[in-house]
């Protein structure tokens, strides 16, 4: 069991997950330990998400949190997979808004917070996958975990019961998969997750058919079945490889569209990456100083 300790108590924590499409964030007091995870998500004090082109609005969200808190500038923990340009823009804006903020850029490494990295080259593992696994390992220790993150890409990651990130799979996300069909064929229409969600809302999960009688439904059902099939096969492999207990955790922006099509028990989580960042902050992890700290 990893012993948690509070960061600098007078400084709140700003946790940032900068993904390929959106920037997710959470704000919490430093003396609040990473919570036990319950169905439905993690109870942050404040949280939100915005697309990359709303950085100005994002900063205002954070400014409002800080004004309400009435305390010192935050300790900021950032996971970025969207590239150095967005990372630098985030750091610059945070430095302008919060004088004295301490920034930490997290990267994948050989081990952290009780989790060992089983990648051949630990640095190659996506930061979001690594930090999300840190969060999941904290929430469900001594458990064989299948972590499904349904975002721009869909990732299936395995955490062994002994605390080793064993590896995983990367698939095109639901939206990317559906768009690829329309953009690389002459006659197939483009549909999105909204169409899939509306289709599923119109029928009970037990009534979802195995095939479709029109092109739009054939695309939607084909793509989501491909994703669900990969998850089911990986779930079976997890059970064959490791002793229990077992848990499948579903997160990411497309999780609600994928959930009705899964046939194994699973638990939803709003953001394992943010939970992992909070765990790292509470285990004394150093991270890499961001631009604001180096200046």
Curated annotation (Swiss-Prot):
Cellular-component GO terms for this entry: cytoplasm
Active site: 128 (proton acceptor)
Keyword Kinase: yes
InterPro entries: ATPase_NBD, Type_III_PanK
Disulphide linkage map: none
Catalytic activity: (R)-pantothenate + ATP = (R)-4'-phosphopantothenate + ADP + H(+)
Pathway assigned to this chain's UniProt record: Cofactor biosynthesis; coenzyme A biosynthesis; CoA from (R)-pantothenate: step 1/5
UniProt KW keywords: ATP-binding, Coenzyme A biosynthesis, Cytoplasm, Kinase, Nucleotide-binding, Potassium, Transferase
Entry superkingdom: Bacteria
UniProt-listed Enzyme Commission number(s): 2.7.1.33
Major localization listed first in the record, in broad terms: cytoplasm
Cofactor stoichiometry and binding remark: A monovalent cation. Ammonium or potassium.
Localization (cell): Cytoplasm
GO biological process annotation, one example: coenzyme A biosynthetic process
UniProt cofactor(s): NH4(+); K(+)
Subunit structure: Homodimer.
Similarity-based family: Belongs to the type III pantothenate kinase family.
Job of this protein: Catalyzes the phosphorylation of pantothenate (Pan), the first step in CoA biosynthesis.
Protein name per UniProt: Type III pantothenate kinase
